[in-house]
Amino acid sequence: MATPDPTQQAWDPVALANQLQGVAEKSQKLLTGFLSAQPNSGQIGMGDASTLGGAFFDLMTKMMSDPTALANAQINLINEGMTVWRHAAERMFLGRESEAAPKDKRFKHPDWTENAVFSFIRESYVVAAKSVLSSVHDVKDLDPATARKVDFYTRQYVDAISPSNFIATNPEVLTTTLQTGGQNLLRGLENLLSDLDRGEGRLAISMTDKSAFRLGENIASTPGKVVFQNDLMQLIQYDPATPDVRRRPLLIIPPWINKFYVLDLQPKNSFIKWSVDQGHTVFVISWVNPDERLAKKNFEDYMLEGPLAALEAIEKATGERSVNAVGYCLGGTLLASTLAYLAAHDDDRIASATYFVTLVDFTEVGDMGVFIDDEQISSLEKRMQERGYLEAQDMATSFNMLRANDLIWSFVVNNYLLGKEQIPFDLLFWNSDATRMPAAMHSFYLRNMYQRNLLAKPGGVTLAGTPIDLTKIKTPTFLLSTREDHIAPWKSTYAATRLYGGPVKFVLSASGHMAGVISAPGSKYGHWTNDDLPPTPDAWFAGAQAHPSSWWPQWDEWVTAFDLGRVAARAPGDGELPAIENAPGSYVVVRSDG
């Protein structure tokens, strides 16, 4: 039997109290300085939670109507709580080893397991969190939208009250505070005030050292030229890397919710550079970061001034009428819409279509659905009408909430409680470089696609006077989804296999919405393939073959079938379009956070 460890770290409450008093005195000066620098224009914004009251009222009503289920949940909580108390007593008085902490990054510090007090706190939280979540999840007779909303926001609450997020109950924070004399908390407060100041009163959590990256130098650095531009986009043509190139150019249509260079972070994981190295003449749309002057730009404008304008420009630049096209996320939704538009006009300029993590059937959108209802959209539209656009931070916050522990609370702990210096990380630098969206376009997108799912219905959406029917698309299609995607759930993207009228190949990558896409050869993520397309995604996965390597070479093999031979390498500016400026261009450098 193990015996109590007399060397276990003892906390000195007097020393800690003295240090915290000193921190409080210094922090008062910092806070006073911050507040005096704020414009006298109202309180610090806290976001819009007005739509939650009705959902939780429905939840409580349904809970109270089933007292037996409520009583059973309480009994289960008491029983599990007694187990936690028993474990704590056995550890304290009998020297019992603490159970290993679950694989949860919040509790990786050894004291969460080795220290009796923090082990008890951790186990108590896990039991309480499980009880709350299961009680909410098991409530009967809630309509699906309400059930999803209360489940999502209950998880937000449970994540927020984790003991790892508080000074007094996080052993790593307490240890660091003792070791530094509270300097970590002062640095953390400085970080907090800096983020509040950068967000103009709204908390804009810093995720990485932004000063470590310069666009065009050590990120988004694949050589190329801007060869065309209009109000909505710049078109980049990349320099060739091979003596000859594939005749048919490759057009990449990224989303405009964020910026294209997620596909060009570093040479080792740049899909753009890798495609150039395979002999593609790569063109990429770099969308503008819009302001109030583009408030009236609609979804059809993005089609007309985006891919359709790019097709004309590419023909002038290369002499080639047709392209292979890739659409990423919202860019894929636009690509599908464009293909249906072209099909209606007997236009075959897109020879093959590749979709990265793209929704076209919005029947089931996962947790994103909690933000989509009449009340919330109307509130958002009102704010957008006042500004002319959706604030970049609004969308970024919504995405971050989908993975709150990774993208919110881990940074709260590291930045504000531990006072750590931020580490340069290319993907987080890109993630923090969010863009605004025109009011008219975003309202159309939310109403017609997310809320009403009209794109999946033949003729449900009309663009530039043309009814859009995805079933008329005969273009060969490659669908790439990712297994852990929290924005475009792969089982939802699979629905596209039943929509398109041409041949379809579906591939599933490991990891999530970004990492699974930029999974370069040599990365740790594999993929799954299945040439059959059964009616359900579960049936597809049951018959899929796992591959330990990147999906990129398989895609390149697929798209090679649509080549037209090879031609001498094309340099930007060789054709009818002169080079305007070096890649990555001037549109991409316009940030929303100044």
Task: State where each predicted segment sits.
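Amphipathic, low-complexity, repeat-rich surface-exposed segments
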Residues: 1-234, 245-246, 283, 496, ...
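Alpha/beta-hydrolase-fold enzymes
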Residues: 141-176, 316, 320, 338-443, ...
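Short beta-strand element of the alpha/beta-hydrolase
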Residues: 245-256
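Short amphipathic alpha-helix adjacent to the substrate-entry channel of hydrolases
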Residues: 264-282
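Gly/Ala-rich beta-loop-alpha elbow adjacent to hydrolase catalytic centers
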Residues: 327-335
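Short beta-strand/loop motif that positions the catalytic acidic residue
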Residues: 473, 479-481, 485
